[in-house]
């Protein structure tokens, strides 16, 4: 289909006519809704690897054409999308006969949502394309070994594919939109099976409360991960509150980098009293500046030594840290705070900037 669309693309504007097999014919016009859908499909298809990379240039040329031919600005400075056909179909009363004349007879509408929606999606792809070099060729691996919770026979809780509140689907999209690829590791980590990874994320290791037979962190696995970090790997350690996470064994690994997850937990939240989970980010905070406010509840504190440095405190306690280890780095926090529930702002007020923080952290790890 994409190859066929290239054959009927207007070479001058890069766009598509309302009746695309009759370009330049009297009365025919460049139409916004279809053109914007094709731009979006080409750009995203190439980014995701479904289409050849040559479609990027095709989409960019078409988008430039859309800005030139479809976008206007009124006297008040508001931007509008022009040339979206209001409707198209066959049959009915009055009878729609599918002729050339019929398809040109339907009225055009300014800012019709059928055109605006695809234009927004196409515009987002153009913005995403600017940041793809950040993570190009890099792989982000999410642990599925130490965290292996199932429900009704299905894996869930902090997984890339989980689109419900409990998953990391949105954070995964942020990594992909920075040019990185996603992967998982369902076996014990080794320097060998981590060799192709730029980032390795371990979240909320299982306790017997969550999994019948947990896979515990041990000295051998810690040796392998430490060697990988020293060689240039970037490690994320996200614990959970002490009642919902296996902490003692997890600390076998954390200790290698001067980090220890310790009680008591902070930021208990009652019901929808969101402010009880507020964490304010001081100006100049590494990684997250200029963000001001994020939401994290029931955080496990950190005890730091060696090269580990605190980058955020809460109630006087260290809660977020970074350690430079050899050629790599480690980021640690005592909560899985970037899962869908707390980045999509469907429940939490918009003043909480977890979504933006997730992108900031991804950029830090990929650069």
Q: Language-model segments: which ranges?
A:
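Aromatic-acidic/polar surface patches that form glycan- and anion
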Residues: 27-35, 108-116, 164, 350-354
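A glycine-rich, coil/turn loop motif that links secondary-structure elements
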Residues: 23-31, 56, 190, 196
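Short, surface-exposed loop/turn motifs that are enriched in glycine and acidic residues
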Residues: 24-35, 44, 240-243
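Secretory-pathway/luminal and periplasmic proteins that interact with or process carbohydrate-rich
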Residues: 6-11, 68-76, 263
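CBM-like carbohydrate-recognition segments
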Residues: 30, 39, 47-131
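Alpha-helical packing segments of well-folded alpha/beta enzyme cores
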Residues: 1, 5, 37, 41, ...
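Short, surface-exposed patches at the edges or C-terminal ends of soluble domains, predominantly
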Residues: 130-367
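Oxyanion-binding "anion nests"
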Residues: 1-23, 27
